[in-house]
Amino acid sequence: GGYGSDALRTIVKHGFEQLNLNRIWCEVYSNNDAIGVYRHIGFKDEGTQRQTVFKNGEYLDSHLLGMLRSDYDKLKEENKIWKT
């Protein structure tokens, strides 16, 4: 992975393993290429709000993505993306 996905994995790992969070979520606009990184490391699509912001002459959708502790634990157990 690149620097962005490595940094995101570090933050998510800290959230679940050090802060003992049950859920981590983010809101990403449809023009943000980083949405693929979130999905790649295991965030799931939880909903879309259509045309929530007007930017650079166009309306953009807002996507809600989330990861549960149980998702993280399963991905770690399967050694997918989350090498310890």
Model-predicted segments: where are they?
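Acidic/histidine-enriched, glycine/proline-rich intrinsically disordered or flexible terminal extensions
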Residues: 71-84
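Conserved catalytic-core motifs of GNAT/GCN5-like acyltransferases
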Residues: 25-27, 44-60
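Conserved GNAT acetyl-CoA-binding A-motif
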Residues: 17-27
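Short glycine/proline-centered loop/turn elements that form peptide/ligand docking sites
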Residues: 4, 8, 31-34, 51-56
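Conserved acetyl-CoA-binding loop-helix of GNAT-fold acetyltransferases
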Residues: 1-14, 36-40
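Conserved active-site tyrosine of GNAT-family acetyltransferases
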Residues: 38-39, 43, 65
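Residue-level recognition of the GNAT/N-acetyltransferase active site
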Residues: 29, 69
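A short hydrophobic beta-strand segment most commonly corresponding to one strand
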Residues: 61-68
